């Protein structure tokens, strides 16, 4: 785990955040909401990924999987992104808040396709919007499911929902689906 008081733990995360430009202060803000996960294969190989714990909106104490991101490749090309084996990605989402705000207590919920995107947004906008500290950030880890949408909306009915998906075709489709779900509720 990332410990804001322990430089040695922070160094282990450096290569996962460097290529995204996510600074140490943003890592401090979300330090409770990410970790490293290592998979050991039978052939002796092991792979460590940055992991964003997936939780059920109604039971955030229980981790039901991980959204995983690998280190950037040496040539600067992409890196591994996916979900840990056995993850409940149909209902589970990454849920983070710099202030530790519970989803049921949120006044603002920000929706993203990845934990990286959420942290980047926070870093870019927190100086101009001090309320972001108390906001709740959720990541669907890719394509949002009906179960994810229903779960978050049911737990945060009075919160203002901010849709921050990518602006590509898929992101616009996700936005339309989420808007419909919000209006039905």
Predicted regions and their residues:
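Mg2+-dependent endonuclease catalytic cores in nucleic-acid-processing enzymes, primarily RNase H-like
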Residues: 163-183
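Short, basic/hydrophobic alpha-helical segments
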Residues: 88-104, 146-162, 180-184
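Basic, glycine-enriched DNA-binding surface that flanks or lies within the catalytic cores of DNA
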Residues: 1-92
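Short, well-ordered loop/turn elements at secondary-structure boundaries
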Residues: 46-48, 60, 103-106, 115
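Short, solvent-exposed loop/turn segments that connect beta-strands within catalytic domains
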Residues: 57-62, 102-104, 128-132
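Acidic, glycine-rich catalytic loops of TOPRIM or P-loop NTPase phosphate-binding modules used
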Residues: 108-170
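Residues at alpha-helix termini
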Residues: 18-19, 123, 184
